[in-house]
Amino acid sequence: MTDNSKTRVVVGMSGGVDSSVTALLLKEQGYDVIGVFMKNWDDTDEFGVCTATEDYKDVAAVADQIDIPYYSVNFEKEYWDRVFEYFLAEYRAGRTPNPDVMCNKEIKFKAFLDYAMTLGADYVATGHYAQVVRDEDGIVHMLRGADNNKDQTYFLSQLSQEQLQKTMFPLGHLQKPEVREIAERAGLATAKKKDSTGICFIGEKNFKEFLSQYLPAQKGRMMTIDGRDMGEHNGLMYYTIGQRGGMGIGGQKGGDNAPWFVVGKDLSKNILYVGQGFHHESLMSTSLDASMIHFTRDMPEEFEMECTAKFRYRQPDSKVTVKVKGDKSEVIFAEPQRAITPGQAVVFYDGQECLGGGIIDQAYKDGKVCQYI
């Protein structure tokens, strides 16, 4: 049996069940475990209650139960500079960003990893549903989590080989119900705590209200592709490509009484385009351009590959051809895709392995730009 007692693992603990079980499993495997709670956002609500305080109490309770030391570290400045400013800039540009991808890259596996190293960590661990496997050459491959419904490799796709070399995902081989069961069996304080939803820093708040505190909304016209005026929109940033509802035009007829969807945006003219039908022709595209292209291991500067891709979380994989040039790439779809959204991540897979990904800049239909920003 391996003696793990000399290997120090610093666990990012959020006060949720996943990170609690992560710490428990590592402790049971004999590692030298330290828990760290990251405070990334000042989330005091209108009643003066800070949810982070409640979460930290849960971290403390679990750490005491499993007998590990724990600390709290404040990354509010790093989060603001590296994640939130990016988030706002993307919305200003008419795009729909994915802050979780950036949060993992810049905070959970950079700021936190650096901090863990000052505590003498050999590895960091989180409660993400993903797996890491080291090959005979010492290269770490990131594989999907065993629980298909919970697999989080989409959000981890910007991690580097250096980051993965120092990372453990103890829940990767488990199904979510098994994780709850382990927590309940061990009597952990967080065993019955519900999973958090929403963007990491907004939590359960009203998204529209939250965004309007930072970006003034500019109302404008809402139109069909053929120029019919459908009324007023509340601000382009509140709408995402492919969105159904929320436009206030549900009762308006046309087409075959099909529901209305957001099918395009024109940032320069401040126009929101809407159309009827889930598969409206303006929502379909055949290729995309992406930037911030990144792979989890060394790849040539310029190459072409066939693989599968996801264009949003929990979506089935689609076959694609990827042409990479530096940190940019063209991704050509084997079948037309719906609602490819600038600002979202495109993530590449080879079977179970997550190869990396990039951020979608523009979608095209047969070589012609889709009016999505």
UniProtKB/Swiss-Prot annotation:
Q: What residues form the catalytic site here?
A: 103 (nucleophile), 200 (cysteine persulfide intermediate)
Which residue positions hold the site described Interaction with tRNA?
A: 128, 344
Assigned keywords, A-Z:
ATP-binding, Cytoplasm, Disulfide bond, Nucleotide-binding, RNA-binding, Transferase, tRNA processing, tRNA-binding
Binding residues annotated for ATP, in chain numbering: 12-19, 38, 127
MF annotations from Gene Ontology = ATP binding; tRNA binding; tRNA-uridine 2-sulfurtransferase activity
Q: Which cysteine pairs are joined by S-S bonds?
A: 103-200
**What EC number(s) are associated with this protein in UniProt?**
2.8.1.13
Q: What is its main location?
A: cytoplasm
User: Which InterPro entries does its entry note?
Assistant: MnmA-like, MnmA-like_C, MnmA-like_central, MnmA-like_central_sf, Rossmann-like_a/b/a_fold
The ranges of region (Interaction with tRNA) come to 150-152, 312-313
Q: Where is this region: Interaction with target base in tRNA?
A: 98-100
Q: Does the keyword Ribonucleoprotein apply?
A: no
Q: Which GO terms describe its cellular component?
A: cytoplasm
Q: Which SUPFAM superfamilies match?
A: Adenine nucleotide alpha hydrolases-like
Q: Can the keyword tRNA-binding be found in this entry's annotation?
A: yes
Q: Where in the cell is it found?
A: Cytoplasm
Top class in the EC scheme:
transferase
Q: Which family does it belong to?
A: Belongs to the MnmA/TRMU family.
Q: What does this protein do?
A: Catalyzes the 2-thiolation of uridine at the wobble position (U34) of tRNA, leading to the formation of s(2)U34.
Q: What protein name does the entry list? A: tRNA-specific 2-thiouridylase MnmA
The organism named in the record is Streptococcus thermophilus (strain ATCC BAA-250 / LMG 18311)
Whichever gene encodes this chain, its name is mnmA
